[in-house]
Curated annotation (Swiss-Prot):
GO molecular function, one term: unfolded protein binding
GO CC annotation terms, alphabetical: cytoplasm
Location of this chain's protein in the cell: Cytoplasm
Reactions listed under catalytic activity: ATP + H2O + a folded polypeptide = ADP + phosphate + an unfolded polypeptide
GO biological process: protein refolding
PANTHER family the record matches: 60 KDA HEAT SHOCK PROTEIN, MITOCHONDRIAL (PTHR45633)
Species, as recorded: Stenotrophomonas maltophilia (strain K279a)
Pfam families with a match to the protein in the record: Cpn60_TCP1
Enzyme's top EC category: isomerase
Family indicated by similarity: Belongs to the chaperonin (HSP60) family.
Main location: cytoplasm
Swiss-Prot/TrEMBL keywords: ATP-binding, Chaperone, Cytoplasm, Isomerase, Nucleotide-binding
Binding site for ATP: 30-33, 51, 87-91, 415, 479-481, 495
Designated name of the protein: Chaperonin GroEL
Gene: groEL
Length: 549
């Protein structure tokens, strides 16, 4: 086992704080409307230019192991805030730095670290309650666009396209961000349920211009097994032909004689049919078929529930206003399923989302909710260069997460004002002893740090601005982009409550751990072994005399 280097007390804490400062100073340069860019070296290709706090934090590794431990712990604040709320990483880092710096000074002055931590925790709990108190729900598309704009570093086009996407697919809908091929941002919306399976034969195509199979007011047959024998399908086909409607078949597989017969019937115009494979695999496939059944008011033909294909009737089939099938995708639009059943199914899936611990499962479940509840929107980010594309895509991702957080928990005045208002509400807060009171004061001072940094990055004097903001009430604050004082809600400067809350709670959590650290253990650096002698025959081996055996 390698030897360890151990540091205690003030020596350990001071090194840790140095690491925190290095990381935080790099990250906080990006805060606010006039925040600066950070250039990140890449092992190959052009460097990345970003204003995204978590992207900067992830790149930082320090040579000194003890300083690096401090930096990595603050990196955890940024990552956790990003996971919780999708934005607010820079705010969380600034708060953590302020709490840790002041806390370490207090411990060095002889105060009890545990009491300081309790004081900080008490202040943060009260501040979170006050944030929830001043939070307002996002009432309209305009508020959503404003939140997106602020999160995307005051880019109004990004805020607007996210608001448009939410308007199209609903607040439960899935919105994904992709790299576009043009210079402008584009929004593609797929309403209804889309899954990534296309037609099994190009002979099903009936729209030559778009190369799709379009079915108006079709019946929909859902089956969880392979269909290879056409005799099994005859009762359903006869019923559909009598009704004079087209038919979509979604099954594990349609092959051989069955597929050939369907193609012939379609070509001859006897009955218009399109067959596609069911999406997913195993249990996920069954669940998605059930989703389709609920959406279309049909039943999954499955032996598990005592239904066989040859006994299926037209009553077991689902219905929809329109179905469009391309080479890669099938879209079911306006299924006729009972809305109460759809809502119940959505609620059931949401419960599964809360219970799962797997990020992959959670993402797939959220996709299912979106497909049932609204649809899918794709924002295609446009830019003139690849470097700009990556930077812009990061900002769109941040803005999208921020707007989702705003819909979830509401909004508070932005620009660091909400935390300053929370300070005034906690004026009379007291701890059990003087050290706890000092911990409360540390937290209250730290809550000014985001506003202080926004103002400093804008090139103004923080103390003057903070005093003026404190003199005001409600959403009165400072617009760093224009240099004006006024109502932040009128300016459209809003932060999601969830983002501000998560940033404060996560910063306090890590700061509490670092303040109460008394020892640090790292691997001792290895001594460089002397170089071997030159290779001039055996005489060169004399260089080995300096080696330890």
């Amino acid at each position: 086992m390698a030897a360890k280097d151990i540091r205690f007390g003030e020596d350990a804490r001071s090194r840790m704080v140095r690491g925190v400062n290095v990381l935080a100073n790099a990250v906080k340069a990006t805060l606010g409307p006039k925040g600066r860019n950070v250039v990140l070296e890449k092992s190959f290709g052009a460097p990345t230019i970003t204003k995204d706090g978590v992207s900067v934090a992830k790149e930082i590794e320090l040579a000194d192991k003890f300083e690096n431990m401090g930096a990595q712990m603050v990196k955890e604040v940024a990552s956790r805030t990003n996971d919780d709320a999708g934005d607010g990483t820079t705010t969380a880092t600034v708060l953590a730095q302020a709490l840790i710096r002041e806390g370490a000074k207090a411990v060095a002055a002889g105060m009890n670290p545990m009491d300081l931590k309790r004081g900080i925790d008490k202040a943060v709990s009260a501040a979170v309650a006050e944030l929830k108190n001043i939070s307002k729900p996002t009432a309209d598309d305009k508020a959503i666009a404003q939140v997106g704009t602020i999160s995307a570093n005051s880019d109004e086009s990004i805020g607007q396209i996210i608001a448009d996407a939410m308007k199209e697919v609903g607040k439960e809908g899935v919105i994904t961000v992709e790299e576009g091929s043009g210079l402008d941002n584009e929004l593609d919306v797929v309403k209804g349920m889309q899954f990534d399976r296309g037609y099994l034969s190009p002979y099903f195509i009936n729209n030559q211009q778009s190369q799709t199979a379009d079915l108006d007011d079709p019946f929909i047959l859902l089956h969880d097994k392979k269909i290879s024998n056409v005799r099994d399908l005859l009762p359903v086909l006869e019923g559909v032909a009598k009704a004079g409607k087209p038919l979509l078949i979604v099954a594990e597989e349609v092959e051989g004689e069955a597929l050939a017969t369907l193609v012939v019937n379609t070509i001859r115009g006897i009955v218009k049919v399109v067959a596609v494979k069911a999406p997913g695999f195993g249990d996920r496939r069954k669940a998605m078929l059930e989703d389709m059944a609920v959406l279309t008011g049909g039943t999954v033909i499955s032996e598990e529930v005592g239904l066989s294909l040859e006994k299926a009737t037209i009553k077991d089939l689902g219905r929809a206003k329109k179905v469009q099938v391309s080479k890669e995708n099938t879209t079911i639009i306006d299924g006729v399923g009972d809305k109460a059943n759809v809502d119940a199914r959505v609620a059931q899936i949401k419960t599964q989302i809360q219970d799962t611990s797997s990020d992959y499962d959670r993402e797939k479940l959220q996709e299912r909710v979106a497909k049932l509840a609204g649809g899918v929107a794709v924002i295609k980010v446009g830019a003139s260069t690849e470097i700009e594309m990556k930077e812009k895509k990061d900002r769109v991702d941040d803005a999208l997460h921020a707007t989702r957080a705003a819909v979830e928990e509401g909004v508070v005045p932005g620009g660091g004002v909400a935390l300053v208002r929370a300070i005034t509400a906690l004026a009379g807060l007291k701890g059990a002893n003087e050290d706890q009171n000092h911990g409360i004061q540390i937290a209250l001072r730290a809550m000014e740090a985001p506003l202080r940094e926004i103002v400093a990055n804008a090139g103004d004097e923080p103390s003057v601005i903070i005093n003026k903001v404190k003199e005001g009430t409600g959403s009165f604050g400072y617009n760093a982009a224009t240099g004006e004082f006024g109502d932040m809600l009128q300016f459209g400067i809003l932060d999601p409550t969830k983002v501000t809350r998560s940033a404060l709670q996560n910063a306090a959590s890590i700061a509490g751990l670092m303040i109460t650290t008394e020892a640090m253990v790292a691997e001792a650096p290895k001594k460089d072994e002397p170089a071997m002698g030159g290779a001039g025959g055996m005489g060169g081996m004399g260089g080995m005399g300096g080696m330890d055996f």
